[in-house]
């Protein structure tokens, strides 16, 4: 095959391309895109080295498409960076994606200049417009994930470039659909059992060549051999057999969990058995890449824009740069229907949106979509037959489960998809099932170090929600040898776990045979954590949670000095592990017994710092206790506690207007308390409380400030406001 594609290429320095040159380059381009898609799938199966080796081998070939090779490497590095959030990995991914941006613009210009049309539906160079926007988007997301106002502002300039180009391509896609009489452009009418290469009578046609061949061209054996190769690569990729795994259909389960039943199939499976009846085997590789790439990138971009703080969003809207959360989610869902990297990244993005730490869809904010909103959904500019309606977009339930289970079947070696299944189980309150699933894989055998560290970190969090603190601390400390993300936070989190073990022993809730050991470990780790703080973050500044940790330890030291305490642990009032749990959605994931234990530890434990009743520490304690009440079906008590002990210290009403008391001790608390108060209004009054909920959310949004967790808190507030607005 190297001989075939070597003879099918020619130097791009040529000023004029013949028809023969064009066919050769078109087929080589389709081949290189299939190679790139295969390489990225290796990564999704926890075999990154195999994927990178495949790209390296292809890059060395004469006439190889460097643009898609570099983008594929950038996507692999992006996944590694966003899974681990390590400074060096994020820097490396950013540099590669920047290179992919430049190459994409050059390749697009080359295709346009030479009228090199590689798609039967779109203008020359369109596929490189997609690679450009994908590079820009992923690069900008790395900047946004820094959770910094400044970096977010810089990212917006990059997103703006991608936005207008994506908008242009998306409008072209709609025109193509209308021209084809509203027939789907994503699935052709060709029966998938028929190869798109017909070699009968020594002639052929190929969906990857976007125009009709002459008799001489259709008899060209080199064209035919390369076209057949591309078609076989595509079929193997679509069925999941391209990376050497046994038939995915044999591993497909119908339910989540380690013991979930398998899907029964009537026919004997083979390596070409598809997981979905909607699989299109006859769509050209370049067209598939364009469709899935635009749906993914334009969809993610719209969701991100819809979640930006209102101040930034309002400015962007003036210049026509705005996003729709519903339209964006619908496009991302559409991308997941494609069996390629775009579909998988789309699914990972949806998992982050529905079950991630930012709580974009809070379990307590289960507002139904009104009838008029369903009609609006169908009239949306992005809506197509077969898309998800409003309620399903908000709570996809089984549809999201099934999509994840398909990825679990396709990529059996990957701890990444196993981790996402565990996260989904946690989101359903099945914490022990989640830990059991994560324990089923041997961490040391996970090839991708970032996935290994992420799985251990998430297992530690789940164990914290279960109050299994000793094992959680062990997991946090084990990360010191695996991940460079935040050694200071790992120490602080582990120390907070040991402190809670010591407190439970003191209170008699759970006796320990080594209380003094845990006490000393808590002291060493909590107060020693700032010493590990380095400036290794992507943007040369401490990470948000590092700054949070540093502020907390400074508070503890100040309290110890003020109260003249000999034991530094006596200077810690509200349990730091319960405070940390709020940032990781812990109170929405705990079961009844776990919530009751959290309530006991927050309300019944005493030490000198707690008895001193420092106002801000009392606010944190009462805030967290109110959440346990709400989740324990004692919402009235929780709301009363919040109204009486927390909110009056945050704001007051003067002549009908809100006057905030700007506080700096724990800046995450104040807007979060206003946000949670809106959920109490919904929980207690349901639809009758929506106006009141909106009022509380507006107040939460008004308490804007640039603090260590501002991006996380404000995105959550913005998502809730949009959700309420849809139902008012």
Curated annotation (Swiss-Prot):
Gene Ontology cellular component terms for the protein in this record: cytosol; mitochondrial outer membrane; nucleus
Keyword line: Cytoplasm, Nucleus, Phosphoprotein
Disulfide bond annotation, renumbered to this chain: none
Main location: cytoplasm
Subcellular locations according to the entry: Cytoplasm; Nucleus
Domain of life, source organism: Eukaryota
Pfam family membership, one: Iml2-TPR_39
Homology family: Belongs to the IML2 family.
Biological function: Inclusion body (IB) resident protein that interacts strongly with lipid droplet (LD) proteins. Involved in LD-mediated IB clearing after protein folding stress, probably by enabling access to the IBs of an LD-stored soluble sterol derivative that acts as a chaperone in inclusion clearing.
Description of how the protein assembles with itself and partners: Interacts with lipid droplet proteins.
Full protein name: Inclusion body clearance protein IML2
Organism: Vanderwaltozyma polyspora (strain ATCC 22028 / DSM 70294 / BCRC 21397 / CBS 2163 / NBRC 10782 / NRRL Y-8283 / UCD 57-17) (Kluyveromyces polysporus)
């Amino acid at each position: 095959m190297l001989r075939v594609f070597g003879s099918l290429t020619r130097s791009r320095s040529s000023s004029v391309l013949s028809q023969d040159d064009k066919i050769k380059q078109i087929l080589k381009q389709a081949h290189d895109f299939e190679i790139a898609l295969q390489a990225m799938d290796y990564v999704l199966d926890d075999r990154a080295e195999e994927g990178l080796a495949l790209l390296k081998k292809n890059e060395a070939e004469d006439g190889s498409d460097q643009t898609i090779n570099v983008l594929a490497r950038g996507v692999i590095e992006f996944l590694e960076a966003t899974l681990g959030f390590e400074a060096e990995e994020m820097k490396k991914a950013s540099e590669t994606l920047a290179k992919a941006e430049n190459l994409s613009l050059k390749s697009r210009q080359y295709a346009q200049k030479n009228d090199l049309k590689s798609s039967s539906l779109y203008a020359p160079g369109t596929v490189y417009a997609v690679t450009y926007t994908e590079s820009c988007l992923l690069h900008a997301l790395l900047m946004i994930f820094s959770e910094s106002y400044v970096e977010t502002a810089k990212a917006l300039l990059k997103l703006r470039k991608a936005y207008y180009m994506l908008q242009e391509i998306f409008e072209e896609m709609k025109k193509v659909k209308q021209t084809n009489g509203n027939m789907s452009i994503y699935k052709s009418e060709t029966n998938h059992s028929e190869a798109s290469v017909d070699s009968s009578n020594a002639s052929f046609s190929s969906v990857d060549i976007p125009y009709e061949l002459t008799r001489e061209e259709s008899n060209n054996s080199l064209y035919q051999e390369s076209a057949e190769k591309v078609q076989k690569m595509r079929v193997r990729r679509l069925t999941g057999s391209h990376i050497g795994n046994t038939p995915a259909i044999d591993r497909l389960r119908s339910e989540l969990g380690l013991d979930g039943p398998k899907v029964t199939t009537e026919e004997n499976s083979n390596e070409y058995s598809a997981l979905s009846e909607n699989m299109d085997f006859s769509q050209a590789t370049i067209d598939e890449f364009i469709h899935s790439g635009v749906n993914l990138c334009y969809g993610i971009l719209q969701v991100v824009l819809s979640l930006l703080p209102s101040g930034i969003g309002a400015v962007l809207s003036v210049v026509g740069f705005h996003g729709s959360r519903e339209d964006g989610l619908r496009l991302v869902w559409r991308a997941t229907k494609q069996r390629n990297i775009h579909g998988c990244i789309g699914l990972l993005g949806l998992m982050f949106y529905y079950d991630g730490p930012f709580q974009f869809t809070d379990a307590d904010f289960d507002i139904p979509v009104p009838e008029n909103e369903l009609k609006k959904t169908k009239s949306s500019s992005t809506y197509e037959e077969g898309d998800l309606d409003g309620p399903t977009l908000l709570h996809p339930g089984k549809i999201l489960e099934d999509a994840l289970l398909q990825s679990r079947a396709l990529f059996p070696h990957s701890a990444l998809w196993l981790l996402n299944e565990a996260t989904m189980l946690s989101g359903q309150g099945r914490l022990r099932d989640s830990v059991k699933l994560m324990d089923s894989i041997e961490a040391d055998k996970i090839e991708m170090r970032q996935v290994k560290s992420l799985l251990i970190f998430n297992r530690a969090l789940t164990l914290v929600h279960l109050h299994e603190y000793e094992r959680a601390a062990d997991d946090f400390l084990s990360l010191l040898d695996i991940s460079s993300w935040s050694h200071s936070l790992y120490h602080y989190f582990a120390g907070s776990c040991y402190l809670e073990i010591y407190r439970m022993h003191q209170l008699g809730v759970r006796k320990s045979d080594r209380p003094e050991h845990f006490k000393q470990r808590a002291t060493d780790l909590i107060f020693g954590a700032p010493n590990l703080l380095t400036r290794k973050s992507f943007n040369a500044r401490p990470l948000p949670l590092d700054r949070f940790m540093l502020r907390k330890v400074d508070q503890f030291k100040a309290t110890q000095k003020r109260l003249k305490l000999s034991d530094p642990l006596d200077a810690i009032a509200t349990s730091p592990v319960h405070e940390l749990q709020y940032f990781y959605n812990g109170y929405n994931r705990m079961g009844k017994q776990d919530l009751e234990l959290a309530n006991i530890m927050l309300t019944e434990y005493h030490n000198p710092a707690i008895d001193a009743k420092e106002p801000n520490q009392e606010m944190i304690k009462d805030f967290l206790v109110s959440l346990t009440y709400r989740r324990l079906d004692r919402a009235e008590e929780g709301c009363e506690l919040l109204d009486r002990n927390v909110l009056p210290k945050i704001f007051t009403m003067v002549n009908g207007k809100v006057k905030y008391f700007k506080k700096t001790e724990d800046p995450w608390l104040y807007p979060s308390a206003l946000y949670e108060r809106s959920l109490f209004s919904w929980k207690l009054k349901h639809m009758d409380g929506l106006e009141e909920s909106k009022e509380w959310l507006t107040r939460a949004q008004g308490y804007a400030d640039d603090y260590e967790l501002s991006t996380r808190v404000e995105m959550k507030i913005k998502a809730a406001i949009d959700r309420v607005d849809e139902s008012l």
